[in-house]
Curated annotation (Swiss-Prot):
Family: Belongs to the hemerythrin family.
Gene3D superfamilies: Hemerythrin-like (1.20.120.50)
PANTHER family the record matches: BACTERIOHEMERYTHRIN
Protein name per UniProt: Bacteriohemerythrin
HAMAP family: Hemerythrin
A Pfam entry, by short name: Hemerythrin
Provenance organism: Methanocaldococcus jannaschii (strain ATCC 43067 / DSM 2661 / JAL-1 / JCM 10045 / NBRC 100440)
Binding-site list for Fe cation 2: 64, 79, 83, 120, 125
Transport listed as a keyword: yes
Length: 147
């Protein structure tokens, strides 16, 4: 039986469909990784984390930042910085821990990712959603596709 380490909630919705769809992909990916770990498929979980969390998140961040820049979102630089710190943390700290560490290290890294994503969507991402809504800006973009 599949379990969820993170459950999508309406509370995560930014009001920008493309970004919400991308966030749902990231949430599903974290749940898929969690289930692979529970099934003893650590190598598959590692590959999924690298392919989807690292690569897809980078595409998602770029998409968000491009839209923010296009419309003059005033908190773009701070938002961009949170993305940069996240990527640096994942590459420099979490990936080595996942590659070389124990299953508990992997689960700890996964917990960090869940916590970060939850907080990031619920606060800074919701903030830009509110800003776009206040300005009456409707984003018609499509969600970034999964590789």
């Amino acid at each position: 039986m599949k379990k969820e380490i993170i459950k999508w909630s309406k509370d995560f919705e930014t009001g920008i469909k493309a970004f919400d769809d991308e966030h749902k992909i990231l949430v599903k990916t974290l749940n898929d990784i969690y289930n692979l770990l529970n099934e003893g498929k650590r190598d598959e979980a590692k590959e999924l984390l690298k392919r989807r969390v690292v690569n897809y998140a980078a595409k998602h961040f770029k998409h968000e930042e491009e839209v923010m820049e296009k419309y003059g979102y005033p908190d773009l630089e701070r938002h961009r910085k949170t993305h940069e710190i996240f990527v640096k943390t994942v590459i420099e700290k979490l990936l080595p821990k996942i590659e070389e560490g124990s299953e508990n290290d992997f689960r700890s890294a996964l917990s960090f990712l869940v916590g970060w994503l939850t907080m990031h969507i619920a606060k800074p991402d919701k903030k830009y959603g509110e800003w776009f809504k206040e300005k009456g800006i409707v984003i018609e973009d499509e969600a970034v596709k999964i590789d």
